[in-house]
Regions:
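Aromatic/acidic polysaccharide-binding cleft in carbohydrate-active enzymes
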Residues: 32-147
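Generic recognition of flexible, low-complexity loop/linker segments
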Residues: 1, 21-25, 64-68, 135-140, ...
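Glycoside hydrolase catalytic-domain groove-lining segments
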Residues: 2-49, 131
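Flexible loop/turn segments at secondary-structure boundaries
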Residues: 1, 13-18, 41-46, 84-89, ...
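Carbohydrate-binding surface patches
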Residues: 134-172, 178
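Active-site-proximal beta-strand/loop segments in catalytic clefts of secreted hydrolases
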Residues: 8-12, 37-40, 80-83, 153, ...
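Composition- and surface-driven signal marking solvent-exposed, interaction-prone regions
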Residues: 20-22, 48-57, 92-93, 97-99, ...
Length: 188
């Protein structure tokens, strides 16, 4: 890195804060690289540490990450934290991976991190979204594979139908794959 590095503060806030601040890095000085030291959303609707990083929090983090990725020219590194917590022995919440003496499991935040880290482009693409919908999105292009990667976070409690059109400069003949992270409501 040939630019000065800046460390942003630890951002452990409510899901609402993350949804309202997806543009957090939009106005940063473009001459410096930023390390977003630690970030995590946690709901205040419960005091149970294990339940504080739930789907609501994970979707808010995904929305925030669209802004981080959109500003990849400035945000050089970003780190979810804290990473591990032993069930029943926590100092804080949220945590990405929970464990006890016999097993471990990833929180919804773990799956957001996995989806984002396994779907990276070489550079980001400009995109517009209709203002009628409050969805969070980022687009990138993978020069090695020729893939266009579109990430969309819909933190709302309802589905939204969206249309995607791609600029003529890309040859998009071929197949498309979709990964989703969503809540399943069981009816009893």
């Amino acid at each position: 890195i040939n630019s000065p590095m800046r460390l942003t503060s630890i951002i452990i806030m409510s899901p609402e804060w993350f949804l309202e601040n997806d543009d957090f890095y939009d106005d940063y000085d473009r001459s410096a690289k930023v390390f977003a030291g630690e970030y995590a959303a946690h709901t205040t609707r419960t005091t149970d540490p294990v339940k504080r990083n739930n789907l609501e929090s994970a979707l808010a983090e995904a929305a925030f990450l669209t802004g981080v990725e959109r500003n990849a020219d400035v945000v050089y590194l970003a780190s979810y934290a804290p990473l591990f917590a032993r069930i029943g022995y926590t100092q804080w919440a949220p945590d990405m991976i929970w464990y006890d003496g016999a097993s471990s499991y990833g929180s919804p935040s773990y799956y957001v991190q996995s989806m984002y880290s396994n779907n990276n482009g070489t550079y980001t693409l400009e995109a517009d979204a209709e203002k009628d919908y409050k969805i969070y999105h980022t687009q990138s292009y993978d020069a090695k594979t020729g893939d266009i990667i579109i990430k969309i976070a819909n933190p709302h409690e309802y589905e939204q139908r969206i249309g995607i059109s791609v600029d003529d400069s890309f040859d998009i003949a071929g197949q498309m794959s979709v990964e989703t992270l969503r809540a399943i409501v069981l009816m009893m």
